[in-house]
Swiss-Prot record:
Its main location: cytoplasm. It comes from the Bacteria. Pfam families: EPSP_synthase. GO terms for cellular component: cytoplasm. The keyword Transferase applies. Belongs to the EPSP synthase family. It catalyses: 3-phosphoshikimate + phosphoenolpyruvate = 5-O-(1-carboxyvinyl)-3-phosphoshikimate + phosphate. This is 3-phosphoshikimate 1-carboxyvinyltransferase. Monomer. It comes from Nitrosomonas europaea (strain ATCC 19718 / CIP 103999 / KCTC 2705 / NBRC 14298). Keywords: Amino-acid biosynthesis, Aromatic amino acid biosynthesis, Cytoplasm, Transferase. The gene is aroA.
Length: 431
């Protein structure tokens, strides 16, 4: 489908069962593959990103079977992939590319990792430099600091590692998941401010489910004790994706509600669950249980503009940018520098598409300032999505004010293949 025309809808109301979290799904797949024992994974996200991880693990010799009831049985390889030479194509899946780079660098094998052109523009130099500190031999095949990569057999000498924290938390997460494979004590020191800290906390939580503990001092120093090995918990469930919840919760706040999402709530280990704090600041009515959240429009009807630090919700923060179109006043989103190195340059892309709708936008290195138009949004705008799933999902919210065309709606397959069907269900429109 080249485009999707969304009609103007008056109200959003209903319940949505969330797909599994992308971030948790790919972490659990990798840890299950590295563990001793067999793991049965339920509610795994079925998407392009998780498909890339599944394909890669199978190429590396991991036995993975999808059962008739939609679960995945992963036979762990006790920390050593059977296949020692492979070429892996990982699309634009950062949650597969970064941790696999770290793990494969310790495997004493010969591997090539590549992706789509955009992945080759996304920096990985800080992770490569950190791995080289302990003896890894990694060649950047086109431009230093960027994929594609070639990994060679190497003598690994675990010890202290320093890594920058200001580009992507996935670099640190990859190191944390990989280094227990050495069996040696390792200390990782983060230089500068660590962005997206909740995603690191998420990594540590998943590692604990497989029996490996990480000690930390603030967000600057992480210690991995010696002689730890991953052990299967037997059965493990993936909680619903909190980033994906943001679109439906936003719809409820914009267009009446109530909209309830099921599969993530107050017990969630995901940082993006804090999106509800921004909704509350905008005046939305929020209620929450252990595994559900419900949103509705403010009692007065109109959302308020906010000035919000988005460091803890880098993905869900994109939803706030489109919500700003419905708020009174100027909304400022801060600490979003990581948007520049995501599936597209999200600061530039979001700025361009918001302007098509009549918004006034000021963009900086790490912030966006958005003022909605004085009158109605521009109807029938054609929104480009830049092969970025979150751009497509964010701008679906525009239909709560005016008709809108979304180009390349199929890009949502990266994390949420049936998103538009779920959106149509709560807006009571045909799809």
């Amino acid at each position: 489908m080249q485009w999707l025309d969304l009609p103007h809808v008056q109200r959003a109301q209903g319940n949505v069962r969330l797909p599994g979290s992308k971030s948790i799904s790919n972490r659990i797949l990798l840890l299950s593959a590295l563990a001793e024992g067999t793991t049965m994974v339920s509610n795994l996200l079925e998407s392009d990103d998780t498909g890339r991880m599944l394909d890669a693990l199978r190429l590396l010799g991991v036995a993975i079977v999808r059962t008739d009831d939609g679960k995945y049985r992963v036979a762990g390889c006790k920390g050593k992939f059977p296949v020692r030479e492979a070429e892996l194509f990982l699309g634009n899946a950062g949650t597969a590319f970064r941790p696999l780079t770290a793990v494969l660098a310790l495997m004493q094998g010969h591997y090539r990792l590549s992706g789509v052109p955009r992945m080759h523009e996304r920096p990985i130099g800080d992770l490569v430099d950190a791995l080289r500190q302990i003896g890894a031999v990694i060649t950047c095949l086109e431009h230093e600091g960027f994929p594609p990569l070639e990994i060679h057999p190497a003598v690994i000498r675990p010890g202290n590692i320093s890594i920058k924290g200001n580009i992507s938390s996935q670099f640190l997460s990859g190191l944390l998941m990989a280094l227990p494979l050495t069996g040696e004590p390792v200390t990782i020191v983060v230089s500068g401010t660590l962005i997206s800290q909740p995603y690191v906390a998420l990594t540590i939580a998943q590692m604990a489910r497989f029996g490996v503990q990480v000690k930390q001092e603030s967000w600057q120093r992480f210690m991995l004790p010696e002689n730890q090995t991953y052990r299967s918990p037997g059965k493990i469930a993936v909680e619903g994706d909190a980033s994906s919840a943001s679109y439906f919760l936003a719809a409820g706040a914009i267009a009446g509600g109530p909209v309830r999402i099921e599969g993530a709530g107050s017990d969630s280990c995901q940082g993006d669950i804090r999106f509800v704090e921004a909704l509350e600041a905008m005046g939305a009515r929020i209620s929450m249980g252990s595994d559900w959240i419900e949103s509705g429009a403010p009692d007065g009807g109109a959302l308020k503009a906010i000035d919000f630090d988005c460091n803890h919700i880098p993905d869900a923060a994109m939803t706030l940018a489109t919500m700003a179109l419905f708020a009174r006043g100027t909304t400022t989103l801060r600490n979003i520098a990581s948007w520049r190195v995501k599936e597209t340059d999200r600061i530039a892309a979001m700025s361009a598409e918001l302007r098509k709708l009549g918004a006034r936008v000021e963009a900086g290195d790490d912030f966006l300032r958005i003022t909605p138009p004085d009158g109605p949004l521009t109807a029938d705008a054609v929104i480009d999505t830049y092969d970025d799933h979150r751009m497509a999902m964010c701008f679906s919210l525009v239909s709560l004010s005016v008709p809108v065309r979304i180009n390349d709606p199929g890009c949502v397959a990266k994390t949420f293949p049936d998103y538009f069907e779920k959106f149509a269900a709560i807006t009571h429109t045909p799809f």
